[in-house]
Each structure stands twice: as structure tokens, then as C-alpha cells.
């Protein structure tokens, strides 16, 4: 799971630098594993045809649709709503089917990734944080010896020894 976090971060960095062709494979890997921002970015790349990736309306609406869950950031939800407003009524059922297929393959139930908007205490700025439900099951306290920049060896008397 941690390699996917690396792909999500690297893809995001390249995306922000507008290096879409380089970002795409990293974002796609993270998107397939359930990371909402990566899903939205893959959808946007398909929607706009960026970085040499051919425009693909079905893939664009599918990826942005799965990213636009209730707990997604407002920007993702609003972008999806804007896309849906441009869909002719005769194609709504087709679009619903595409989004349903993507949600069944890459949504929370399929990937085990849960996302929430979180805020730092005292701040009005929220960020979308996604975690795999089993991400920490196989880790122990020694794997998390630096949490929030503080060594657990400095703060946890159980780890100091006699």
C-alpha cells in the first residue's frame, strides 16, 4: 500500500508541474487503488487530452464519477456536476452505467480505501485524506517511530527500555 502512496505523491507532483505524460502512469496506479485525487486527475487528463493521452469521454466521466463520492473535495464534486450538466438527456443512462461500472471496480468497496476531509485543529482549510482500511494492520509501533516529526522513542516510555 505504501508504494501506492508514493505513486500518488509523485504523480501529483508531476501533475502540478504540468508534466502530464510523466504523471499519468503514477496517477493511474493510485487511481486504480482508490485514491480520489488521483482518480480525478486521471479523469481530467482524459477529459482534456493532456500529455499525449487521447481524449476519452467515457474514461473521463468514469474516473471523475468514482472520485466524486460524498466525501470527496468540493472541487471534484463540482467538476463532476459540471460534466453531468452537459450530458444530453438521451445519454444519461449510458453515463450512469459507466460511472456505476467504475465505482464497482475502483470505489471504496472494491479497493478498501476510505477518504475523509480532515482539518488541522484551529484551521478552516480541509484536505482530502485517503487511507486503506487494512493499511496499518501489519505494522507495529517500531514502524511508526517518527509520527508528526516526533520520535516515539522520545515520547513513549514503553520503548525506552530499563
Question: Where do the language-model regions lie?
Answer:
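Consensus positions within tandem repeat domains that build extended binding/scaffold surfaces
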Residues: 35, 41-51, 64-65
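Hydrophobic face of amphipathic alpha-helices that form TPR/SEL1-like repeat modules
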Residues: 5-16, 41-48, 78-84
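Short helix-capping/linker turns of helical repeat alpha-solenoids
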Residues: 2-3, 7, 14, 18, ...
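Pro/Ala/Gly-rich low-complexity, hydrophilic intrinsically disordered segments
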Residues: 89-137, 141
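Canonical positions in the second alpha-helix
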Residues: 29-30, 67
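Short, low-complexity, Pro/Ser/Thr/Gly-rich segments in the mature regions of secreted, periplasmic
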Residues: 141-161
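Repeat-mediated protein-protein interaction surfaces in helical alpha-solenoids
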Residues: 22-26
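TPR/TPR-like (Sel1-like) alpha-helical repeat modules
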Residues: 54-75, 81-82, 88, 93-106
Amino acid at each position: 500500500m505504501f508504494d501506492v502512496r508514493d505513486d500518488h505523491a509523485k504523480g501529483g507532483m508531476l501533475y502540478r508541474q504540468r508534466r502530464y505524460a510523466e504523471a499519468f502512469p503514477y496517477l493511474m496506479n493510485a487511481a486504480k487503488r482508490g485514491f480520489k485525487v488521483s482518480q480525478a486527475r486521471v479523469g481530467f487528463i482524459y477529459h482534456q487530452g493532456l500529455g499525449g493521452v487521447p481524449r476519452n469521454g467515457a474514461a473521463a466521466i468514469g474516473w471523475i464519477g468514482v472520485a466524486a463520492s460524498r466525501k470527496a473535495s468540493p472541487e471534484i464534486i463540482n467538476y463532476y456536476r459540471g460534466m453531468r450538466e452537459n450530458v444530453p438527456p438521451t445519454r444519461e443512462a449510458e453515463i450512469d452505467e459507466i460511472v456505476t461500472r467504475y465505482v464497482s471496480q475502483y470505489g471504496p468497496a472494491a479497493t478498501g480505501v476510505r477518504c475523509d476531509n480532515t482539518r488541522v485543529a484551529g484551521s478552516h482549510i480541509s484536505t482530502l485524506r485517503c487511507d486503506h482500511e487494512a493499511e496499518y494492520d501489519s505494522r507495529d509501533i517500531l514502524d511508526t517511530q517518527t509520527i508528526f516529526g516526533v520520535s516515539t522513542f522520545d515520547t513513549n516510555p514503553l520503548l525506552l527500555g530499563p
